[in-house]
Amino acid sequence: MKKLIISLAILFATSLLFAQMTSIPIAKLETLHSTIVGEDYKLQISLPYPFNPENNKYPVLFYLDAFSTSGGMNEFAKMQMVTKNLEQFVMVGISYNTNPRAYVKLRVRDYIPPINKTDTIHGGDKFLSFIKTELIPYMETNYGTDPNDRGLLGFSYGGLFTTWAFKKEPELFKRLAIISPSLWYGEDEFILKNPAFLKNVKNTQNLKVFIAYGSLENPHFGESSTKLYDVLKTNNNIQVSKVIFEDEDHGSVWNAATTRALFTLYGDPFKALIKESNRFNDAKKYKQALESYELAFKKYPEQTDEWDKYDIACIYAQTGDTDNAFKYLQMLVDSKKDRYEHTLNDSDLNSLHSDSRWVTLLNAFKKGNKE
């Protein structure tokens, strides 16, 4: 009965949440012409709910490659804001009014900085000027975004651009998400060993940076990301984190990395790890699920609860690691939490039934329930 009541309560709360979510537009589509670049940019503007610009100045996150990546990230961020797992902020995806073939050429033009003064192919400098002098003022005027709290998120060439933007305009953004950056472009001297970049790293007072890449990507991505992380770590005023996503390649790392990036920059990092583990578990990627859970337990032990211990025990049971499964279930026994019925009937724990410790565990739960 207790399990039924809990399930109904969760179902009711979830139904209310989704009913609320269906009435909230995911993103507004607008077009902003840039006289600097000579391009009409399509903006995908996702607003927090409720949105009260008269009374609030909202942090804003600009993200690149919105042509192909916006939908899922906007929906995820919107739901996490409604459930208060993320702070309220505005998201602005920068895209193009074009077709996929032209999009590839345009991102090369905009995201790659000119390698020297004779480089007329790459226009990263003009694109950065568009963001600084046209897009940012537009958002501050029309949506009340906070001029002191801007973020930038980029992937691949976009990650290169995000890093380079810090080199050129160190005060423009306070939060950076750099995913699988193409920092091999121009070799280390172009950014990582550039005197202007190193000077900005040394003098920065307040910056939060998230760096990520997949373990199955070309080694260049991991090597350059690690070099970037090591340079940023030299300044204690820069909060920098680096995550390697196991079994993810250049085509798949985006979804995992953006989820963690949003939580790292705008949310509770413990909740980020737990939700990430749940996502991996649902996809039956148990190795990655356990890595996220164990990291959460290690870094934030005071935030873990009984259900977290129960969930990780179930994942270990599904992988055949009975020792760790019993270890976490025993923690529940020690905390004297009533989990007897739930443990007895959970099919995720079926692999433990033949173990001699199973009966002992159930008896311990029964004894704890009577105390």
Map each language-model feature to its residues.
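Alpha-helical positions within canonical tetratricopeptide repeat
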Residues: 288, 324, 357-360
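Alpha-helix capping and inter-helical loop/turn segments
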Residues: 300, 320-321, 351-356
